C-alpha cells in the first residue's frame, strides 16, 4: 500500500521533511493540497492525502451536486495563488452520486468534463500525482481515529453520542454488549476454523485471505481450482462442502463488523 486517504481532522501535527520543529494542525488545519509522508511504528512509511473537508461536506450534504458547473467552479476556485503543485480533491460515499442525490452521477460527469474542456485543471488520480510530486512534508496522525466519527472509533464499540438529531431520545448503549458479543463469537469461530481447517487446507488463514477469489467468481471451475490449490490435493465431496462452510463462516465473521450495522 503506497498511500491512503484520511479526513483532515485525523492529523495531529506536521513539518517539512528534514526540519526539527513540528506544527500543530489538529482540528482540520492541515493543508489538503499536497501529499504527506507518515512514518509508521514498523519503520515503513506511507503517503497520506487529507481530503478537502468543506467541499466534500458540501458535495455530500450542501447541494453542490445540483449543478455540475457550480461544482467545477468550486473545485477550480479552491487552488491557491501559488506556483507549486497543488491537488484539490474530495472524498464522499459512492452512493452520494445518484442514490442520495438524484442525477448526482451526471453532475459529477459534467463537472469533470467542464474542468478539462475549459482548461481549468488537470484531472488526475492519487497514484499519478504521488509519482510526479512525492511528499515534501511529513505528519503524525491522531491514533485510533476515523473519518466519520469525531469520537475516534467509538461508533463501533460504545455509546459515542453521534446522531442525526432526528430522534433526540435515542442512545447507543447497545453497542458495547453487542461488540463484546461479536468479539467473543469471532474468537470462538476462529478456534473452530483453525481446528477444522487444518485437515483441509495447507494454510487455513492463507486460504481465508485468498477466498476473495471465490467471492468474486463463484463459478464451479474457479471453486474447484481454488480448493485444489489451497488443499494441495483433491477434496472429496463431503470435504468440499465442509471447506466452503468454514470459509463462509469466516467471511460472515468479518461481515458482522460492517460499519452500517453500528450506526
Residue positions per predicted region:
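Structural recognition of the beta-strand scaffold that forms the well-ordered cores
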Residues: 4-5, 89
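Short, acidic/turn-prone active-site loops that include or flank metal/cofactor-
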Residues: 7-11
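Active-site and substrate-binding clefts of carbohydrate-active enzymes
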Residues: 22-263
